[in-house]
Curated annotation (Swiss-Prot):
It is an enzyme of class 3 (hydrolase). Belongs to the RecU family. Its cofactor is Mg(2+). Keywords: Cytoplasm, DNA damage, DNA recombination, DNA repair, Endonuclease, Hydrolase, Magnesium, Metal-binding, Nuclease. GO terms for molecular function: endonuclease activity; magnesium ion binding; nucleic acid binding. It is found in: Cytoplasm. It comes from Lacticaseibacillus paracasei (strain ATCC 334 / BCRC 17002 / CCUG 31169 / CIP 107868 / KCTC 3260 / NRRL B-441) (Lactobacillus paracasei). It catalyses: Endonucleolytic cleavage at a junction such as a reciprocal single-stranded crossover between two homologous DNA duplexes (Holliday junction). The gene is recU. The record marks K103 as: Transition state stabilizer. Binds 1 Mg(2+) ion per subunit. Endonuclease that resolves Holliday junction intermediates in genetic recombination. Cleaves mobile four-strand junctions by introducing symmetrical nicks in paired strands. Promotes annealing of linear ssDNA with homologous dsDNA. Required for DNA repair, homologous recombination and chromosome segregation. This is Holliday junction resolvase RecU.
Length: 208
């Protein structure tokens, strides 16, 4: 099935392979899973112990071509995303609304702002105005380092670009203004540790 973005470009989710077997490279921690897969597993764990309710957002799709090889079966051949996606995940934790994006890079010294889109930045702005807890889970794959980075800081970096600001966020700034995560067995990515830090910073609550 071919799925297209609103601008007509074909969508590639990394799950379509040639007939030859292709092994997925180990991106981080020797597990061979993508950042998104690890976050999905972590969210399942958090839900199983009733600690947080967080899900990956579904993306609306408009079906434009369907084949019926059998009367009782339908095969979708072509579809389009109805609207640009906002962010990857949202949910509730400790009474706070969470909204966040997951990004990774092979760069060692900085994180490129081109990995974000204007509509995602505007979505973060709107959520922050409603007192949401908004952030990005950033992975430096080559360095094997993982951070929770506040959306407010991301927006500041984004807004400085037209005035000659950097096109990337230096790693040292992410270390200074973010919260470093340390992968473990369960959950794989303990991102709620970073959320606790954001909540403390925002409202002065004591962790736990």
């Amino acid at each position: 099935m071919t799925i297209h973005y609103p601008n007509g470009n074909p969508y590639k989710d990394g799950t379509q392979f040639s007939s030859q077997a292709i092994s997925r490279p180990t991106i981080y921690g020797g597990r061979g899973m993508t950042l998104e897969e690890e976050l999905n597993i972590s969210n399942q764990y958090y839900r199983s112990i009733d600690k947080a309710v967080v899900y990956k957002k579904p993306t609306p799709v408009q079906i434009v071509k369907v084949d019926y090889p059998k009367r009782s079966q339908a095969v979708i051949r072509e579809a389009y995303f109805k609207t640009p996606s906002t962010t990857d995940y949202n949910g509730v934790y400790r009474g706070f609304y969470l909204d966040f994006e997951a990004k990774e890079t092979k760069n060692k010294a900085s994180f490129p702002l081109k990995n974000f889109h204007q509509h995602q930045i505007e979505h973060f702005r709107r959520c922050l105005k409603q007192s949401g807890i908004c952030f990005v889970v950033i992975r430096f794959a080559t360095l094997k380092r993982l951070f929770v980075f506040p959306a407010g800081r991301l927006i500041d970096c984004w807004d400085r670009q037209p005035d000659g600001g950097r096109k990337s966020i230096p790693l040292k700034d992410i270390v200074t203004n973010g919260f470093e995560l340390h992968p473990q067995l369960q959950p794989v990515i303990p991102f709620l540790d970073g959320v606790d830090w954001l909540i403390e910073t925002k409202v002065g609550n004591v962790r736990g």
